[in-house]
Amino acid sequence: MRKILLFIAACVLPFALFAGENAPKTEENIFELPISKMPPEYFKYEVAFFKEIEIDCNFAFLLGGKLEEKEDARGIYYEFSGGDELAQTMMLCKDGKKKRRVYYELTQILPGVSPIKIITPQGVGAEIRVYERVKTIEPKKLKRKNK
């Protein structure tokens, strides 16, 4: 019985080690939101994802992307997954290629609960854009005549 278990362990161990090497690498991004005396509904927090890519002068963005809310023992976090499919304009460029940020088309508004934890694939960055409500614009009410 012991020999059978050792044989099974010897057969399974290389596959377990091989699977660990091919697991996708991720980065954890933790954002501490600024403290304010204003109520939380005065702010919107938008998350945007990007990659640093060698690209010419054309406008470009990455297609797709998916943001999932998950929960573990440490609390709520978000997990982003996105592809490498690039969309861009097709104009002629004089300059060569330069390394610059290319954003995914996906952006999403998140609740203002600090800290915000986002897991991204290796090489994908995340940033939080903070929007503040400056004033509320009321609509003009026009009286219409019924015909």
Give residue ranges: language-model regions:
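Intrinsic-disorder/low-complexity, polar/charged segments enriched in Ser/Thr/Lys/Arg/Asp/Glu/Gln
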Residues: E28-I30, G75, V113-P115
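Aromatic- and glycine-enriched beta-alpha-beta binding-site module
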Residues: G20, I109-L110
